[in-house]
Amino acid sequence: MSGSSERELAAIVRDLGCGPYFLGTHDKRFPGFLAGDKLACAIVNTAGRETGGVHWLAFGWNPRSRTCYMFDPFGFSDRRLKQIYSFEYEAMLRRSALASSPDRCLSLEQSTQTVQGPDSAACGLFCCMFLHAFVHWPDRPMDGNPTMNLLTGVPNGMLQSPQVLPTLRRNQEELYRFLARHSPYFRSHRAAIEHATAFDKMKQLRVSQ
């Protein structure tokens, strides 16, 4: 197994205090934030559930600022998300805007830096970490808060550069330490989770094929 299961992510998110706001894990058909007056968040896969999943993203809705946050651990642009994963979220944003604001307008803020290594399978866990930041600091979840300050972002264009690998490896180590402090579920299943989400997991899978 590689990556994180929906059950694991839901358990960790609950441990991190996101339960009252968490709409669950979804595939690419996530309908959006339809109760527009409530703080809400979700973890969304870029693929259909029938495929087994490809890559996890996190979304948060702050009704006070009418802002939708999209966190991608790789920090890909809209164009690259569509190119690599065939993932489009415009329809979700339109549904959210219709439901959430009188003037049908909202702001989108998305991550632009890479915090995850190119062969890491920890995207779901990074999404859990972001949602902890979102529910505790909903006006500044991307950075400038104690949770996300544990990670160091690098420009997305350097994702495949050997010179940033030590930084991205440290990020994954910080991620595991953070979850070990805050999630009893992670502590109970740490060895299995770290094996399935290892920093070089995708490389391991390529070699074994």
From Swiss-Prot:
One GO MF term: DNA binding
GO process annotations (BP): proteolysis
One cellular component term from this protein's GO annotations in UniProt: virion component
Notes on how activity is controlled: Requires DNA and protease cofactor for maximal activation. Inside nascent virions, becomes partially activated by binding to the viral DNA, allowing it to cleave the cofactor that binds to the protease and fully activates it. Actin, like the viral protease cofactor, seems to act as a cofactor in the cleavage of cytokeratin 18 and of actin itself.
Enzyme class: hydrolase
Residues the record marks as active site: H55, D72, C123
Site location (Cleavage): G52, G53
Enzyme Commission no: 3.4.22.39
Catalytic activity: Cleaves proteins of the adenovirus and its host cell at two consensus sites: -Yaa-Xaa-Gly-Gly-|-Xaa- and -Yaa-Xaa-Gly-Xaa-|-Gly- (in which Yaa is Met, Ile or Leu, and Xaa is any amino acid)
Inducers of expression: Expressed in the late phase of the viral replicative cycle.
Coiled-coil blocks: none
Superkingdom to which the source organism belongs: Viruses
HAMAP family associated with the record: ADV_PRO (MF_04059)
Extra facts: All late proteins expressed from the major late promoter are produced by alternative splicing and alternative polyadenylation of the same gene giving rise to non-overlapping ORFs. A leader sequence is present in the N-terminus of all these mRNAs and is recognized by the viral shutoff protein to provide expression although conventional translation via ribosome scanning from the cap has been shut off in the host cell.
Subunit structure: Interacts with protease cofactor pVI-C; this interaction is necessary for protease activation.
Function in brief: Cleaves viral precursor proteins (pTP, pIIIa, pVI, pVII, pVIII, and pX) inside newly assembled particles giving rise to mature virions. Protease complexed to its cofactor slides along the viral DNA to specifically locate and cleave the viral precursors. Mature virions have a weakened organization compared to the unmature virions, thereby facilitating subsequent uncoating. Without maturation, the particle lacks infectivity and is unable to uncoat. Late in adenovirus infection, in the cytoplasm, may participate in the cytoskeleton destruction. Cleaves host cell cytoskeletal keratins K7 and K18.
Protein name, UniProt field: Protease
Organism name: Human adenovirus D serotype 9
Lineage summary: Viruses, Varidnaviria, Bamfordvirae, Preplasmiviricota, Tectiliviricetes
